């Protein structure tokens, strides 16, 4: 029912947009992050570049903070062409494009340089377009850093400390299996509902990157952050193929060029925001721990090993990524 209501609202927005400006083409972009998040700022930057590149002929209209629905709902709206663009985690996209689940596997990348080489190289670009058969055209990867655990009642020093804890995860089978492999009880909850879930004790903690932990104000509830960096799942900027196929080659170039500019800008912003977030949460009284990551890597290593017999194709993809120099 909510999806129908959102679709109806989007149709009204479209009608209003057409009346206000019958010369410029407007594409609606919705996402679930707050306006202070570096990824939102990068999308605003991209919108400015699109308008500049097109001389005002093409515009992006941004709806942040889950105004038009959850990540999953936004993807479904893209599939029917009721929404133009969205930003989602690759973990959510894996429900539509299964190979993207590779990014959710633990300790896949050696470092940030390795990660960006994969995103920007042949492997990453192939995966980016893998959702086209589901009417989802990937434009670029936005950096989402490394995911770590944060909790309410006690710190996490080693995997054993997670046992029995209810940890919020994304709607992703891979994320669920990873947290389960470390002994915790994975609990899928939408991002917009997580603050309340933490407050009310529905979950004992969650896992995410530092900037998201800070901008969501989860530090007000969770006073322990463990930098174990178990996975590095990028965000993906996606456009509906229904909308994409209706654009001229010139309009596609305006968008692609702006997306690439925004990617460079976003990575710079992300690096700065990680440092700012760390300082801010420590000032707010959060205890930050740097555990021996090898303990978490060893405990979760069975996930990749099991692929050799359970999913040879995905195992080969993991090997390809690990071999990128």
Predicted regions and their residues:
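Short, low-complexity disordered leader/linker segments with a strong preference
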Residues: 1-26
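N-terminal secretory/targeting leader peptides
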Residues: 18-114, 123, 131-325
């Amino acid at each position: 029912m909510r999806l129908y209501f959102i679709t109806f609202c989007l149709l009204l927005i479209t009608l209003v947009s057409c009346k206000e400006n019958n010369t410029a083409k407007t594409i609606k972009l919705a996402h679930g992050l707050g306006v202070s998040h570096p990824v939102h700022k990068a999308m605003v930057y991209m919108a400015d570049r699109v308008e500049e590149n097109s001389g005002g002929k093409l515009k992006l209209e941004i709806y942040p903070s889950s105004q038009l629905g959850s990540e999953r709902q936004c993807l479904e709206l893209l599939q029917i062409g009721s929404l133009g663009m969205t930003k989602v985690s690759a973990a959510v996209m894996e429900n539509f494009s299964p190979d993207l689940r590779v990014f959710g596997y633990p300790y896949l990348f050696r470092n940030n340089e390795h990660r960006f080489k994969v995103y920007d190289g042949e492997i990453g670009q192939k995966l980016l377009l893998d959702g086209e058969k589901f009417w989802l055209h990937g434009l670029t990867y936005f950096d989402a850093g490394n995911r770590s655990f944060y909790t309410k009642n006690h710190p996490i020093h080693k995997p054993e400390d997670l046992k029995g804890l209810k940890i919020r995860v994304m709607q992703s089978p891979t994320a669920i299996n990873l947290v389960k492999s470390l002994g915790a009880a994975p609990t899928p909850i939408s991002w917009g509902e997580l603050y309340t879930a933490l407050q009310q004790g529905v979950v004992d903690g969650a896992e995410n990157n530092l900037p998201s932990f800070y901008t969501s104000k989860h530090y007000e509830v969770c006073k322990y952050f463990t930098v174990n960096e178990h996975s590095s799942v990028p965000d993906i900027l996606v456009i509906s193929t229904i909308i994409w196929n209706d654009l001229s080659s010139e309009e596609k170039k305006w968008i692609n060029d702006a997306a690439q500019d925004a990617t460079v800008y976003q990575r710079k912003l992300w690096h700065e925001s990680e440092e700012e977030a760390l300082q801010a949460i420590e000032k707010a009284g959060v205890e930050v721990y740097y555990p021996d990551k090898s303990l978490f890597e060893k405990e979760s290593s069975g996930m990749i090993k099991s692929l050799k017999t359970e999913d040879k194709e995905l195992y080969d993809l993991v090997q390809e990524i690990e071999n990128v120099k």
